[in-house]
Amino acid sequence: MTDIAATAEMQAALLSRALPYMQRYEHKTVVVKYGGHAMGDIELGKAFARDIALLKQSGVNPIVVHGGGPQIGAMLTKMGIESKFEGGLRVTDQKTVEIVEMVLAGSINKEIVALINAEGEWAIGLCGKDGNMVFAEKARKTMIDPDSNIERVLDLGFVGEPVEVDRTLLDLLARSEMIPVLAPVAPGRDGHTYNINADTFAGAIAGACKASRLLFLTDVPGVLDKNKKLIDELTVAEAKALIKDGTVSGGMIPKVETCIEAIERGVEGVVILNGKTPHAVLLELFTEHGAGTLIVP
């Protein structure tokens, strides 16, 4: 057998094995939160766009939600605005929220749309303001003061939490064979614009759409056990236990908590996976073993 024939046979075998998984997700909604290192790598960005295009061509209804923290920080520095933090969280004043909206909804959003469109699909860039899709309220965050051990309220300015999601526009776009690319910016009923954590925003969107899967592309392979080995699958109860016993710690805690909240809103399964792996989305959805940690009810 020639090398060309062997390669063709291998590709055919891969497609054959992927078929049952393609059928499983046909006509289902999959929300993908795109962030981390992959957003800063041109080739990984192209591979991600190709994955999203292939999902659509396979009959899946993908929705992309993206972050952009490093890009926001870079723009603030460029404009001579000092980034302020409270308890490790960015404080977003009026001037900052205007820049956040410009970077997320204006710059990054359109770059992702262009990448997907270059793969032959029809993507459209939106944020929570469009079609009154998402309404937010000022986030209520607290922290324990390390000196006094007293809980205090953090004033993060125009940092919000999604409290209302209307899926009407998203359903319309799905029927129109379009791929929504969403920036985590939303209005409040008070007339202010709010910057929302992209993970939280993605969880709210996935919950409202009763998504089959919510994928979080991160810079880590997934949830690790005490021996630093990847855990393939967890139930919500098991995930809560890992947080309680300290196995899940640091920045992974809010990530796992967001996964749990999404499942409680009706998402069938949430996956934390490494976005630095080329075609991580396809590996997770269309292969037997997946590519990260799946959290299920």
UniProtKB/Swiss-Prot annotation:
Location in the cell: Cytoplasm
Molecular-function GO terms, alphabetical: acetylglutamate kinase activity; ATP binding
Listed GO CC annotations: cytoplasm
Catalytic activity reported: N-acetyl-L-glutamate + ATP = N-acetyl-L-glutamyl 5-phosphate + ADP
Broad class of enzyme this protein falls into: transferase
GO terms for biological process, alphabetical: arginine biosynthetic process via ornithine; L-arginine biosynthetic process
Highest taxon in the source lineage: Bacteria
Pathway where this protein functions: Amino-acid biosynthesis; L-arginine biosynthesis; N(2)-acetyl-L-ornithine from L-glutamate: step 2/4
Predominant subcellular localization, coarse grouping: cytoplasm
Annotated positions binding substrate: G68, G69, R90, N195
Keyword Lyase set for record: no
Site (Transition state stabilizer) residue list: K33, K255
Keywords associated with the record: Amino-acid biosynthesis, Arginine biosynthesis, ATP-binding, Cytoplasm, Kinase, Nucleotide-binding, Transferase
EC assignment: 2.7.2.8
Membrane spanning stretches: none
InterPro entries, alphabetized: AceGlu_kinase-like_sf, AcgluKinase_fam, ArgB, Asp/Glu/Uridylate_kinase, Glu/AcGlu_kinase, NAGK-C
Cited Pfam families: AA_kinase
Described purpose of this protein according to its UniProt entry: Catalyzes the ATP-dependent phosphorylation of N-acetyl-L-glutamate.
Family designation: Belongs to the acetylglutamate kinase family. ArgB subfamily.
Protein name: Acetylglutamate kinase
Native source species: Mesorhizobium japonicum (strain LMG 29417 / CECT 9101 / MAFF 303099)
Gene designation: argB
